[in-house]
């Protein structure tokens, strides 16, 4: 059978603030750090759920001293309840999340 690139396609969302990505089970593929804030590091927390009381998948420090941007972090992990992402502060940082 010929290769169909759409069979492996992921949805994506570009975020600059706290956001509910999904409210059902799925797979977190990647998080790309597009820009960090040189003035103040922000912490991004990734939850398996629909709010901040859910299980934590990852805590990511967005600091331009730590990353060369853009940087893509590969997770390829499942989530059971949903995918919720918070930013610790309003900064110039932004990320792109790809998921199924």
Spans of features found by a protein language model:
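Surface-exposed, low-hydrophobicity beta-strand/loop segments enriched in small/polar/acidic residues
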Residues: 1-100
């Amino acid at each position: 059978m010929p290769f169909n690139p759409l069979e492996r396609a992921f949805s994506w969302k570009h975020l600059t603030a706290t956001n509910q990505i999904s409210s059902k089970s799925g797979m977190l593929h990647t998080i790309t750090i597009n820009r960090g804030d040189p003035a103040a590091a922000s912490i991004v927390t990734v939850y398996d759920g629909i709010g901040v009381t859910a299980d934590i998948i990852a805590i990511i420090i967005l600091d331009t001293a730590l990353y060369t941007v853009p940087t893509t972090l590969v997770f390829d992990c499942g989530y059971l309840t949903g995918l919720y992402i918070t930013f610790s502060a309003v900064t110039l940082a932004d990320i792109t999340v790809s998921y199924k």
